[in-house]
Amino acid sequence: MFDHLDRPEFVALRAAVLRFVDEELRPIERELRLDSEAVWPRDVLRRVWRRSSELGYYTASLPVALGGQGLSIVETCALKADLAASGAALAPHVLGELGGPPRVGNMLKYATPVQLERYFKPVMRGEKSTCFALTEPHSGSDALSIRTSAVEDGDMLVINGTKHYISGAPFADFAIVMCVTDPGATPPQITAVLVDLDLPGVTVEHEYVPMSGQHIDADIRFDNVRVPRENVFGGVGNGFKLGMSRINVNRLLHCPTMLGLAMSAYRASLDYARSRRQFGGPIARFQAIQHMLADMAAALWACESMIAHTASLADAGADLRMAAAACKLFVSERCFEVADKAVQIHGNVGVTRGHPVEQTFRKLRMFRILTGTSEIQRNTIAKAILEPAGTEREA
């Protein structure tokens, strides 16, 4: 995947990251019997974060000025695809996908010097983890309908409300919480606030597990939680703008993970088709199997090409609203189809609980919901292609 990326330093980095997975992460997984559906001990995650940070991988996607390697977005996509395709349970933590630098990288410009030192630099060093808390029980795609409130009380803000399905919350140290600070405004004034999750009144609840089986989501409840006003992130009333500033690139950066997962299912299907024997020979000789493999290969090539082009647009500073939505829509649906064909090729093995292909099928089904459903992506695309040039609309 992404074989056209031939910058020598990046080629060496890709190889080094995969060696790290094979030589350091897989032994940890074997020793502790960790798979993607295990409850990951926080001390183990911190070891991985810190070690990845020491090696320069954890912050690789950040600018050099912030201690990163200044990877382009297309290079970051290639690394993410490699890690997802590796099948390692701890692979998402190499780049800090679930609470590390990628969660905050494009928002660091909004941080005050104090916030950088107290919250974000520890994230970059692998010492702290964060999560982005927007979704609520009654507020999914309709982000402006959130009800979590932050009310001024002298130099403090008092926060009340509930956040739902927050990715990375089970192992986060603090959250970037979207709060209503002026419910009377039209639309409601939304402000981002940095909230330590060990404060009195904060409860992180793990009452559900998504169909992927991964313990990576939780609800966060705030009951009269007091935080200093200096924890306002990005300015009062700028929360929605801040959230939208990350959404397009965030949608794009989910796509290489889908691609890597689908690629792993495709590779497994190739191996299985060559080794599984029926009626006197390998099932790969049957045209029905060949056609499924051909469709999978074509879909993966199309997805990789679309991701690479969209990432190149992002690197050039282009407006990604339509492109990122189209990419997320297309890649999520095609990669799920690849996983479905992989299950079909594997037969009864493919529907056995815990088989890698079965796990990949469940993971990829979720991506048609996460970070904006397929229907929301279609809405965004339709708005972009139907509105007059220059019209400003949110994603």
What are these regions (language model features)?
Residues 145, 198-228:
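Flexible, small-/acidic-enriched active-site or ligand-binding loops
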Residues 131, 147-149, 174-178, 192-194, ...:
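Conserved hydrophobic/aromatic beta-strand scaffold that supports enzyme active sites
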Residues 1-89, 110-115, 122-127, 152-157, ...:
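Alpha-helical interface subdomain recognition
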Residues 156, 160-205:
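A short core secondary-structure module
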Residues 91-114, 140:
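N-terminal glycine-rich flavin-associated loop
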Residues 71-73, 142-144, 168-173, 186-189, ...:
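Short glycine/proline-enriched turns and hinge-like loops at secondary-structure junctions
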